[in-house]
Amino acid sequence: MADFQVVVGDDDGTAYSFEVDGQDANRFIGRAIGETVDGDAVGLPGYELEITGGSDQSGRPMHGDINGAETAAILSEGGVGFNPTVDGERKRVTVRGAEVSEDTRQINASIVSRGEQSIDDLLGGEDDE
């Protein structure tokens, strides 16, 4: 059975972390970077989340250009998994495909559409009133 840590980024820069397992985790399996998931999977009813990335149990980042869920060694000029220090530097890096699988441990997501209640209300946060 898969279990994930889902990190949901808000427009204001706040990030919320959720532990997801069981049936809720199955809603993510088979989805790829750029696809949307119902917010009920992480306890945010009425919200819609877009998968923006993630990583596997070894820390390999998900790469949107790699189909499937397998690992691949790519020659990277920069971007996901490698930040060059000099112009023209390239490096072979191992990345995970764009599809969420049982090997995925962390999923990054952003909010596409909001529900009626605020996230703070849903999570039991304190009001500043």
Curated annotation (Swiss-Prot):
Annotated PANTHER family: 40S RIBOSOMAL PROTEIN S6
Protein name: Small ribosomal subunit protein eS6
GO CC field: ribonucleoprotein complex; ribosome
Annotated PROSITE patterns: RIBOSOMAL_S6E
GO molecular function annotation: structural constituent of ribosome
InterPro entries: Ribosomal_eS6 (IPR001377), Ribosomal_eS6_arc (IPR020924), Ribosomal_eS6_CS (IPR018282)
HAMAP family from the UniProt entry: Ribosomal_eS6 (MF_00512)
Family membership: Belongs to the eukaryotic ribosomal protein eS6 family.
Any single biological process term in GO: translation
Species assigned in the record: Natronomonas pharaonis (strain ATCC 35678 / DSM 2160 / CIP 103997 / JCM 8858 / NBRC 14720 / NCIMB 2260 / Gabara) (Halobacterium pharaonis)
Ribosomal protein among keywords: yes
Pfam family name, one: Ribosomal_S6e
Region forming the signal peptide: none
Domain of life of the source: Archaea
Protein keywords: Ribonucleoprotein, Ribosomal protein
Ranges for region Disordered: 106-129
